[in-house]
Amino acid sequence: MEEEKETEGLDLAGYKEKIPPVNKGFLTWEKDLVFTARIRGYQFEYDPQAQEGCWPTDTLLMSLAGCLAIDVVSFLRKMRAEITGFKIDVSGERNLTPPQYYKTMEMVINISGKSITPKKMDRVIALSQEKYCSVYHSLRKDIKVDVKYNITNE
């Protein structure tokens, strides 16, 4: 019952309402195997040699971390936690043969602040994975995604 009160009304209203139903961007060939991606006014480069940009799978890994981060920070703020530091260390193990998809992804959240408890962290991570993180729900179902955290209360 107490957990229900603590998470009652937790949603991403406002943030999720601004997400368009269709995203559009474009990718331009620059040279060799270097491409520039542009979406919503932002740009980044892809380069399989990792000299002028990153691999597409790198941005997939970071997209998952970004989606999780937005959910976790949004929910913790609604739970009246004060966040003073937040970082996610990410890693992914890929299949060795084509298609070289991620077999596992690991996210380690390092968070500091006030009123941040393991119970709150477990709850907000579960909400992100079960309902809100669109990147998580866009991944292959056989990818093992492990999320851990380290809390430093100040």
Each model region followed by its residue ranges:
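Extended beta-strand/beta-hairpin segments
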Residues: 1-62, 73-154
